Amino acid sequence: MKRNPSQVDLPVESILNRLDPYVFGSMSLGHEDVPFETRLSMARYAMERCGWFHTSHKYGSTMDVLAQAFREWPMRIPKCIFKLSGDSLDEVRRQIDLQLEKLGVEQISIGQLHVGGALAADFNAGGKCLDGLRAIKEEGLVGAFTLEVHPWTSHIALDHLRGGQGRDIIEGYSFYFNPLQRYALNDLFALVLETRRPILSIRTVGGGPVEKQAARPERPEDFMQKRSAELLPVYAQSDCANWVDFSMNFVLSQPGVICTIGSCSTPAHLDDYLAVLKQERPSFNPSLTRKILALQTKWSDEKDVHAPEWSM
């Protein structure tokens, strides 16, 4: 399975063109209820099989695990997408320095930028922060930036995309995108597709098998259980082998999607992801795609657009 590069507008030299369809999400390496050596073994297993990792210094002890794995196996260090956030450019720079020093690498291949506060205002006004981000790239600290999107920050990305400022800096958009979630609100998602901007989809399987999520007791606050119950009949109509197969085939078939970022804690789970990439099969069923996208449009209007910050 390969992405279709004709679906996006990217400079030939952009490092985003070198992304693999699947990026190993490292969050589970920070789960301290699992022995350190077990997590280290998982990191080595992923390094042997995956050319790209996604990580953050906010993922518990994930960076301790990765730092040791990178020291032990420097010839297999993957390219990395790092989460970067802050209300000022100085804060973003501090996070860059912190993470580079922690992992002992010289460059953040892709910086997934979450802007807030004064930085967000300056960013959308075409202010000095854009020159600061350009300088970071020119120094070789970051190969490319994408803008991280949540329902409560979609307006920032929408204003940025409409205004066109800093398009040379922000090369794509990173957000939850799987059969159960699409965190770019409807108007932003439509404009991203219209302008052929690259999408880095996050959270490949949306929290786990749809059957298990749908089987949870109904509770008003459990919106994922409700969504799973609505999606379950669509999933049942597919010929996919399992939920991983269904989720990856759906999202990687969508216009603009250049990779999917999925976390896993066991070698067997990672093998499930990689097995899907080896398939030679037609595109995802168009009828099922239309049904999923219709549900996501409805969910965006009903729930996502009203979501308080970090509530989902």
Give the ranges of each region predicted by the language model:
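Hydrophobic faces of well-ordered beta-strands that scaffold small-molecule active sites
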Residues: 20-25, 51-55, 78-82, 108-113, ...
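Aromatic/hydrophobic pocket-lining residues that form the small-molecule binding cavity
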Residues: 39, 66, 92, 126-129, ...
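Structured C-terminal cap/extension of enzyme domains
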Residues: 15, 37, 44-47, 72, ...
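Active-site mouth loops of central-metabolism enzymes
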Residues: 25-37, 81-91, 116-123, 231-241
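Hydrophobic packing residues within well-ordered alpha-helices of enzyme cores
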Residues: 66-69, 156-161, 270-273
